[in-house]
Amino acid sequence: MAAGDGDVKLGTLGSGSESSNDGGSESPGDAGAAAEGGGWAAAALALLTGGGEMLLNVALVALVLLGAYRLWVRWGRRGLGAGAGAGEESPATSLPRMKKRDFSLEQLRQYDGSRNPRILLAVNGKVFDVTKGSKFYGPAGPYGIFAGRDASRGLATFCLDKDALRDEYDDLSDLNAVQMESVREWEMQFKEKYDYVGRLLKPGEEPSEYTDEEDTKDHNKQD
């Protein structure tokens, strides 16, 4: 037998059992391999379990964020329409109620809270006196961009940029059904919170003449 062959056989025996007489006994090498295999299996199981928990956590966070967004869309709009908060100080207390009249776009712009302490805005062709909400609709307010303007498009698209304002009369004809429904909802909310003082006139449209009786009747309805 060559020496090289003996070396190979010794190496083989060294990696097996110390004695082959027991037949069924497990060698240290086999035990180590089994332990190593079990370790990998445990690690893989832990990884899969951890990954499942991570996916579950991500899903829960996504659901919470979706719920918060829906609440913001639903109640945030109401908060915007409910501008006058309890205990809010505003110049409205010193201003008499405005007599009912109709406005052109140019006339409406005079009531932006800077040139005139009274603040008006239009929604869906209706003009509302929002002076008591000056904290919100005044020049320094978060929604001051709507003061003295037709706010319909901005409210329908929830856009507070100048892009939502039109210098000419806006017939809103390009808004879709959902956006127009939003405009009507805003109109109802402003009717509940603020004084309706007249209509926003279309180009060439003549203003209506309102009697004191009609004016008083409208104010009583709002009260």
From Swiss-Prot:
Cited InterPro entries: Cyt_B5-like_heme/steroid-bd (IPR001199), Cyt_B5-like_heme/steroid_sf (IPR036400), MAPR/NEUFC/NENF-like (IPR050577)
A Pfam family this chain is assigned to: Cyt-b5
UniProt region (Disordered), positions on chain: 1-33, 202-223
Additional remark text: Non-classical progesterone receptors involved in extranuclear signaling are classified in 2 groups: the class II progestin and adipoQ receptor (PAQR) family (also called mPRs) (PAQR5, PAQR6, PAQR7, PAQR8 and PAQR9) and the b5-like heme/steroid-binding protein family (also called MAPRs) (PGRMC1, PGRMC2, NENF and CYB5D2).
Positions annotated as glycosylated: 15
Keyword list, A-Z: Endoplasmic reticulum, Glycoprotein, Lipid-binding, Membrane, Nucleus, Phosphoprotein, Proteoglycan, Receptor, Secreted, Steroid-binding, Transmembrane, Transmembrane helix
The protein's name in its UniProt record: Membrane-associated progesterone receptor component 2
